[in-house]
Amino acid sequence: MSRLVSFASLLAAVNAHGYVQNIVVNGVYYSGWEINTYPYMTDPPVVAAWQIPNSNGPVDVSNGYTTEDIICNLNATNAAGYVEVAAGDKINLQWSAWPDTHHGPVISYLADCGDDCTTVDKTTLEFFKIDAVGLVDDSTVPGTWGDDELIENNNSWMVEIPTSIAPGNYVLRHEIIALHSAGTEGGAQNYPQCFNLKVTGSGTDSPAGTLGTELYNLDDPGILVNIYASLSTYVIPGPTLYSGATSIAQATSAITATGSATSGAGGAAATGSSAATTTAAAASTTATPTTAAAQTAKSASAPSSAATGSVPAAPTTATVSTTTSIATSVGTTLTRTTLATTTTAAAAEPSASAPAPSGNSASGSNPLYAQCGGLNFKGASGCVAGATCKKMNPYYSQCVSA
């Protein structure tokens, strides 16, 4: 019984936050790094997502933002493959369920990795910002943020690869920064995710970048901030937005095929459109196009639209190691405000990898990193074994490691 309790506690901790489960490019679905299964496999599938342990909690920045973990997450190692995209393509990143209390900006970067993203030293990558959405609406405390737009869009986010960048191999760094406890130094929580891309096209720009360990400081105004006070503006942390970045009014798209990441180095990137190797999906999803919310007046950064990205359907795939996680995490048909479950021809059994919603577990004990108190909080105040409820501010208490 103790082993079962321990395992349940572990699952609760793992599902307390989020990670990117898959990406979609031009209707083609590519699996991400499935944290609940791939870390335990001797020969996991080749994906474009960088590899991390079975953890999706925040990066530990208690000693500052110079930790290597801030680059691509905890103990991240290079992805074994890449996905080919054309400059100007839009990439949809599908997160698992994101807690609605973890307000903050959503930011995306690119870094040129030279000849081979699978072997590049991550500490040498220099990132330039291609997308950022911070404070959208400050009419009510704590405000509406980029992550709220992500949640509304079925926990997905869409970003466009700038048309002006030169062809080559790049690492896409996509991140949510949760600010619910950012009123004290070291309280902001970073959740970076990385993917290897081979970008084709005819652009010529090679934007200057910033080392991952130099993107932020503990006292940056967008990192050290009390979101429970009235904010008229918010300075999105990190370097300025690349001048060639495009603010897009997004619409959801249908998944028409499944694709597999290409193993190894990308080699020399060609001009023209990307040509992914795909198989037709047995089922696809459609959604009603939506318009991006106006938000540039609130964020002190270059204009950027709120994402209303595409919603993955459950593609039928012959890859045994990934069918369960795909079916449980992306088998939905969604408009911006409506979620409906679809049924595929070969539905998989429920998986422990299905993300748990934030909040209280059935036992009355909250998982690690979940809210356990605060002004007007009505849920349980207990935490799972090994965790304790810590008061971050009058509005928010959180389960943290004891």
UniProtKB/Swiss-Prot annotation:
Disulfide partners: C72-C194, C113-C117
Catalytic activity, reaction form: [(1->4)-beta-D-glucosyl]n+m + reduced acceptor + O2 = 4-dehydro-beta-D-glucosyl-[(1->4)-beta-D-glucosyl]n-1 + [(1->4)-beta-D-glucosyl]m + acceptor + H2O
Binding positions for Cu(2+) per the UniProt entry: H17, H102, Y191
Lipid biosynthesis in keyword set: no
Record flagged with keyword Metal-binding: yes
Signal peptide segment: 1-16
Induction: Expression is significantly induced by xylan and slightly induce by cellulose. The degenerate binding motif 5'-SYGGRG-3' that binds to creA involved in carbon catabolite repression is present in the promoter.
Superkingdom of the organism of origin: Eukaryota
InterPro entries linked to this entry: AA9, AA9_LPMO, CBD_sf, Cellulose-bd_dom_fun
Cofactor(s) annotated in UniProt: Cu(2+)
Keywords (A to Z) from UniProt: Carbohydrate metabolism, Cellulose degradation, Copper, Disulfide bond, Glycoprotein, Metal-binding, Monooxygenase, Oxidoreductase, Polysaccharide degradation, Secreted, Signal
Biological process, per Gene Ontology: cellulose catabolic process
Location relative to the cell: Secreted
Annotated protein name in UniProt: AA9 family lytic polysaccharide monooxygenase E
Organism per entry: Emericella nidulans (strain FGSC A4 / ATCC 38163 / CBS 112.46 / NRRL 194 / M139) (Aspergillus nidulans)
Gene: LPMO9E
